[in-house]
Amino acid sequence: MKLFLVLIILLFEVLTDGARLKKCFNNITGYCRKKCKVGERYEIGCLSGKLCCVNDEEEKKHVSFKKPHQHSGEKLSVQQDYIILPTITIFAV
């Protein structure tokens, strides 16, 4: 009976890294692992002391999606009546 109770407790035990891999921080499309897989590269360290492994193909898709459209040397010919100055608020300091 004791063995049965121990078996039930072990079945409901959830491992910390078993269910899902933790994602890396700072908007990096990678996962924290002990070793990187083939086709992945090491980006930065995770908080848990593991490596942040980034898949090269997924990173290219992510960077091209987030990259804003740049104008090819075109200058705007619109004249403004005022000058836009940078402002600093109390909350920004």
From Swiss-Prot:
UniProt keywords, alphabetically: Antibiotic, Antimicrobial, Defensin, Disulfide bond, Secreted, Signal
Localization, UniProt: Secreted
GO terms classed as biological process: defense response to bacterium; innate immune response
Main localisation: secreted
Listed Pfam families: Defensin_beta_2
Record function comment: Has antibacterial activity.
Protein's UniProt name: Beta-defensin 128
High-level lineage: Eukaryota, Metazoa, Chordata, Craniata, Vertebrata
